């Protein structure tokens, strides 16, 4: 890279350069382990490779992106602290993004935060684009009892709100995102009231509020996202991120992760009950592989899935209706079937979001995409088209 991987040792009395402090933080994280808050997102993903301190300095030495979010079509992305490729994507490509959602903290059932400090992100992108996520995550799952306690127990809620505000102010972010999933159906009104309270608190501190909501095609009041009242919540929050993926998921029947007809139904319902310009469409950058016997089902990022196909002799087909790849093949585990998106899938969803005048799209998650995808996504952000 034209420079030594490690700088010479500092002379006595000389301040340690900022990147060295951040590398030290990362090394501490590597030894402490992911159990101290580097949890996976519920049912969707496994932990990826650990941090690579040899490469980290190169990214941290790049100029900090301090540009504000754009006024046109947005591209947002989710950053996770347990995968170095996610860090790389933010540092190198944040100039193509309008919001970076930091997959940050869970709660215990008393309203205390679970997770490690997100200080590293300060060296990666500017405050104007940072959004800090808080979810009802306990022991790596979206916990019903945690959600119920925060939404219905005033003392627990007070503690949770205080922790959200203090942590967000300390880190320095433009906004907060709430990702409460698997909420008890009877807590639907309580969830709406909680978001209304939080919106008031955050607005007084010049911070925005967004939520991550499970995809719906009607006002269903049951199921994984039944407690999210799209119409009511859509009037409260600044941005409404819809997780338009897991149409089929790892522990279910094989099928597209997010077929185009299904995604369009999700958009049509949402735009019928809230302003389109509040909606940010979640776009998956991953796929699933299922055993035909229902065993050893797995999730892979798009880059890893493409490599996976080179390890077998698959029959790969592009499904133009679903807008995804489908493949069948054999491994030592038996017959397998996989569905996953590629750049064509992402491009189709960008155009669909723009066609319906949405605020933009959000990528789950940063680090799953091949780097060359950003050429097209960055160009679309500047000059979107239907």
Regions found by a protein language model. Name each.
Residues 109-115, 188-312:
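Substrate-binding surface in catalytic domains of secreted glycosidases
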Residues 161-190, 242-253:
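Active-site groove signature of glycoside hydrolases
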Residues 100, 178, 240, 281, ...:
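Conserved, mostly hydrophobic/aromatic
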Residues 49-54, 138-147, 283-351, 381-386:
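Glycan-binding loop/region signatures in secreted carbohydrate-active enzymes
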Residues 80-94, 153-169, 221-231, 341-352:
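Short, acidic/polar
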Residues 1-21, 25-29:
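N-terminal Lys/Arg-rich, disordered targeting/topogenic segments
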Residues 349-386:
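Acidic/aromatic/glycine-rich contiguous surface patches that form carbohydrate-binding/processing clefts
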Residues 39-163:
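Glycan-recognition patch characteristic of GH18 chitinases/ENGases
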């Amino acid at each position: 890279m034209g420079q030594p991987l490690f700088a010479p040792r500092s002379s006595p009395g000389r301040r340690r350069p900022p990147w060295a402090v951040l590398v030290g933080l990362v090394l501490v994280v590597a030894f402490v382990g992911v159990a101290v808050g580097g949890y996976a997102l519920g049912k969707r993903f496994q932990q990826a490779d650990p941090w690579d301190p040899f490469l980290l300095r190169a990214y941290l030495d790049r100029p900090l992106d301090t540009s504000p979010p754009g006024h046109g079509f947005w591209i947002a992305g989710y950053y996770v602290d347990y995968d170095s490729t996610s860090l790389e994507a933010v540092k190198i490509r944040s100039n193509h993004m309008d919001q970076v959602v930091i997959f940050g903290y869970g709660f215990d059932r008393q309203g205390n935060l679970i997770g490690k400090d997100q200080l590293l992100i300060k060296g990666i992108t500017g405050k104007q684009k940072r959004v800090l996520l808080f979810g009802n995550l306990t022991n790596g799952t979206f916990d019903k009892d945690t959600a119920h306690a925060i939404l219905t127990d005033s003392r627990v809620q007070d503690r949770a709100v205080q922790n959200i505000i203090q942590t967000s102010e300390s880190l320095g972010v433009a906004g907060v995102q709430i990702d409460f999933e698997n909420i008890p159906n009877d807590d639907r009104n309580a969830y709406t009231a909680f978001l209304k309270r939080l919106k008031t608190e955050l607005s007084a501190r010049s911070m925005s509020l967004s939520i991550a909501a499970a995809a719906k095609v009607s006002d269903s009041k049951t199921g994984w996202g039944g407690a999210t009242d799209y119409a009511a919540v859509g009037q409260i929050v600044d941005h409404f991120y819809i997780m338009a993926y897991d149409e089929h998921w790892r522990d279910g029947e094989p099928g597209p992760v997010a077929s185009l007809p299904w995604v369009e139904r999700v958009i049509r319902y949402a735009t019928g009950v809230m302003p389109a310009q509040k909606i940010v469409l979640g776009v998956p950058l991953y796929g699933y592989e299922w055993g035909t016997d229902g065993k050893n089902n797995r999730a892979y990022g798009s880059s890893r899935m493409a490599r996976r196909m080179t390890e077998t002799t698959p029959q790969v087909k592009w499904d133009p209706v679903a807008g995804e790849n489908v493949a069948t093949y054999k491994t030592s585990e038996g017959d397998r079937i996989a569905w996953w998106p590629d750049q064509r899938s992402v491009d189709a969803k960008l155009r669909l979001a723009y066609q319906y005048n949405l605020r933009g799209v959000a990528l789950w998650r940063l680090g799953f995409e091949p780097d060359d995808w950003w050429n097209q996504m960055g160009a679309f952000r500047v000059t979107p088209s239907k």
